[in-house]
Amino acid sequence: MYKRQVEQIEDVAKYDTVKEVDVVANFGHIRAGKYEEVTADIKACADAAHKYGRELKVIFETDALTEEQVRKACHCAMDAGADFVKTSTGFLTGFDAHGATPEIIKVMQEEVGDKCKVKGSGCIRTREHFLQLIDMGIDRMGVGYRSVPVVLDLDR
């Protein structure tokens, strides 16, 4: 179980200024097919966040997973009571970085439907990509500060 993560969530979630908490799912367990453990870990984190009225975002590091693993991880998060599923932290090493591709966002949206929100994060660096994700109905995006002027077309 994510005992330390639960303790950290409890430490920060009690502050009124905290509205959401991010947690990284154990992608090693996801890759190994240990979905019951993944669900239990996320549920413990969701329970801790919800105890204080905070939303929980679960990050999968989709660049380290197959499409099928992402689909199953989405179900783990939904079953555990997560509020968001999120593509990546932006700090994963050892894998090619693709981040919030339209393809992986579509997969996540297909799996969670209206039961969970989707946040795309990582590699959103062009206005076209940004607008495409908006057109797809993504709930939220994380855009690196260097990319903000580009995606918002502020460099005119």
Model-derived regions, located:
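Short amphipathic alpha-helical patches
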Residues: 36, 69-72, 100, 131-132, ...
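Alpha-helix-loop-beta-strand connector modules within alpha/beta enzyme cores
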Residues: 35-57, 62-64, 75, 79-80, ...
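Generic hydrophobic/aromatic pocket-lining and core-packing "Φ" positions
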Residues: 9, 42, 70, 74, ...
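Conserved small/polar residues in nucleotide/adenosyl-binding loops
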Residues: 1-2
